[in-house]
Amino acid sequence: MDRTLLIMPESGLQFDWQAIAANPYGKHEPSLSLVSYKALYTNRIAQARAQGLEPVLVSLPIMDENRYFAHITRGMTMQERKNVLYWLGGKTERLRNIHALYNLALFRLAAVQCIHIVDITSPMLSSTFYDELLSEDGITLSPAGEALVDAELGKIKAHEAA
């Protein structure tokens, strides 16, 4: 059976950061809620199976919450940055935690659906220089990060050929 990789770069960190900066006391939702994220993947898995394909999930890459915070607040005033940080509970780690929730959802979905997941998170975290695997924005893969992901995906192809 042919395999298809299901990859979605969205990790729940797409918020209206300007709105948060303007009103850090308000309720703000990501552009793709965790419930919608899981439903979207569940639908894609069903579509792949309906086409006779074996779906394979790919975990989310790591992220650097401090670099990402600097990225999402660039161009903001000091007060707006403080407002965003306040909304995050005073810690940029909340960004990493939100990202991790979406990543864990992928692993749970793979288990429930009995499908394979390519874990790119672990080798990235295991890297001594994991910060070099990310671009300046703290969430986009650098060329080195892309090479690591390609190597992990290559392991699947090598396993299939064996």
Give each language-model segment a name.
Residues 1-143, 147, 151-162:
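Alpha-helical cap/lid subdomain in secreted, periplasmic
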